[in-house]
């Protein structure tokens, strides 16, 4: 079976990465802004720790060396924040800046041009997703 080269952004503690790493696929990059999540991911995947970084995805896209975008990537995956789209959210946070982070996921995807994209999110983002897919 061919090994998949994958990137996981908004990776959290690595729930999505876990299955792919268990199948010995190649984690090329994992990014999250939360240092505790990154520490957990590095603990679970010490052999990939150099590819796991604690950084704001917006800064990564704007400031990172272009070598990240040179790798041949089969799969880009991630779970952009969902608080503003979740039906469990009882607060009115429609203007929460995290609601726009899916746009940076898409911008990252355009830069690396993966064969496949996997976005994990809540049902409430579906209306936004329809707008995204028409672009």
Task: Please report, for each region that a protein language model flagged, where it lies by residue.
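Conserved active-site and SAM-binding loop architecture
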Residues: 1-135
């Amino acid at each position: 079976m061919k090994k998949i080269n994958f990137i996981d952004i908004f990776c959290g503690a690595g729930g999505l990465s876990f299955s792919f790493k268990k199948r010995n696929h190649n984690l090329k990059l994992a990014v999250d802004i939360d240092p505790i999540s990154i520490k957990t991911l590095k603990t679970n995947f010490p052999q990939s720790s150099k590819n796991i970084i604690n950084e704001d995805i917006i800064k990564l896209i704007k400031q990172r060396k272009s070598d990240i975008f040179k790798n041949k990537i089969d799969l880009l995956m991630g779970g952009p924040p969902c608080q503003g789209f979740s039906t469990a959210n009882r607060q009115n946070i429609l203007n929460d800046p995290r609601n726009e982070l899916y746009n940076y996921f898409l911008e990252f995807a355009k830069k690396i041009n993966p064969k496949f994209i996997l976005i994990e999110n809540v049902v409430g983002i579906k209306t936004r997703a329809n707008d995204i897919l028409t672009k």
